[in-house]
């Protein structure tokens, strides 16, 4: 799309985007994965990597469905930031461990990684795990329903969707974007209900019954 171009092996956001426009998405949808990428922001820059984004006409912008790994130049950002808006957060949901964050200066490359493994989520920054949480738990829903996403009923519910980079009005560069898809884990099923032999069929002449 117009705000994006390729220069010297990097995807670059020109900085022409806004909250309502300026996104680029993958053709393919992903479910469980390890996603890593290098990124570099302009001074005071703001961007993000979103996943499980649902593309439907009723969703005007990607972030009303897709969680976001926030990318931002905190020291030079022109406005005060809430904790849930800062670098490495699961935007407006979960906060990273600041003691584990080692950020290269603005204008230099940093590396980030998202792991989404059957609802277990990790955020990494420059080789350090800075955040992990479980999606769709009671705590997750409490955060969703009491904060920024209270009026975004479909936020974070999709288990599969496209990846999305954000041009939020600041030039940004991305390279070495790599993904490894992870297997879907089968849900454990209880084969005996403890009450009767439903789901079982007698084989042979023996009599089977339920006791205790």
Predicted regions located by residue number:
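Carbohydrate-interacting regions of secretory-pathway proteins
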Residues: 1-212
């Amino acid at each position: 799309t117009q705000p994006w171009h390729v220069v010297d092996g990097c995807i670059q956001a020109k900085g022409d985007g806004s909250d309502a426009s300026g996104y680029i998405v993958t053709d393919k949808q992903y479910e469980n994965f390890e996603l890593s990428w290098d990124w570099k922001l302009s001074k005071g820059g703001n961007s993000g990597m979103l996943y499980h984004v649902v593309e439907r006409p009723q969703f005007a912008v990607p972030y009303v469905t897709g969680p976001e790994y926030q990318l931002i130049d905190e020291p030079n950002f022109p406005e005060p930031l809430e904790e849930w808006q800062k670098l490495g957060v699961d935007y407006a949901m979960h906060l990273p461990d600041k003691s584990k964050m080692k950020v290269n200066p603005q204008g230099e490359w940093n590396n980030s990684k998202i792991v989404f493994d059957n609802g277990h989520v990790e955020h990494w920054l420059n080789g350090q795990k800075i955040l992990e949480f479980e999606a769709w738990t009671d705590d997750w829903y409490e955060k969703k329903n009491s904060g920024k996403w209270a009026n975004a009923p479909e936020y974070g519910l999709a288990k599969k969707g496209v990846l999305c980079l954000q041009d939020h009005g600041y030039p940004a560069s991305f390279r070495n974007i790599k993904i490894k898809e992870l297997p879907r884990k089968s849900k454990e099923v209880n084969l005996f209900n403890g009450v009767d032999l439903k789901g079982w069929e007698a084989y042979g002449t023996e009599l089977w019954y339920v006791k205790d």
